[in-house]
Amino acid sequence: MKTLKTMLMALAFIAAPAAIRAQASADAPAATVTDLDQKYATDLLKAGTDAPDITLNTIDGKPFALKDLRGRYVVLDFWASWCPDCRKDSPFIMQLYKKFGAKGVAFVGVSFDKNLESWKNGVAKLGIEYTQVSDLKPMRESPVAKAYHIGWIPTIYVIDPQGKVALATVVSDKVSAYLHSVYPDCAE
C-alpha cells in the first residue's frame, strides 16, 4: 500500500508540470489579427506622421500625386499581383471601395509588380476598380516602399484629409473598423 502511495505521488509530481502546461495553452487565446500587426507592422509609419508624397504613374501611364488628394481620406493599399495574401484581401478591399468611395474616400493601390503586363492582368483578374499606381520596382528596391517602411504586403495605410497617417496596418478588418468610425452612417 505504501509503495502504491509512493508511486502515485511520484506520478503526480511528474504529471503536474505537463497538466499545467496543457491548461495554460488551453487558456491562451487563439492567434488574433492583432498578432499580425505585432509581427509585420511594427516598423510602419505611426499615426500623426506626415504621409510621404507618392508621385508615380497610373496603370494607364498617367501621372499621379498623392498630394492631389488632400482634403479627402485616402486608403493606400500596398500589394502585388503575385502575393497570395494580397489576392485574398482584394475582394474585401473592393467592398470597402464601393462602400466608402461613395463617401469620397479615395482608394489607391500601390503595386510592387515588376512587369506591366502582370500588373494589368492581376488588376483585371481581381476586378480592381480603384486607381492603381506603380514604379514597376520590386518592394525591396522601391523608394515608395522605403518611404512607407513596407516590409510585408498587403500593407494598408489610411491617410487623413490633412495628409497625415491615420492608420497603418496589415489587417484589412482594421481599415474597415476605422472607416466605419469616421463614417458611422455606413452600415457594417
Language-model segment annotations:
Residues L126-I128, D135-P184:
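Thiol/disulfide oxidoreductase modules built on the thioredoxin-like
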Residues G71, F78-Q95:
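Conserved redox-active cysteine motifs that mediate thiol-disulfide chemistry
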Residues M1-A26, C186:
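Bacterial Sec-dependent N-terminal signal peptides
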Residues K88-L126, K137-K146:
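Structural microenvironment flanking redox-active thiols in thiol-disulfide oxidoreductases
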Residues R70-R72, A102, I128, I150:
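Active-site acidic short loop of glycosyltransferases
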Residues A22-D53, N121-A124:
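N-proximal helix/coil linker or "cap" segments that precede and/or mark the start of modular domains
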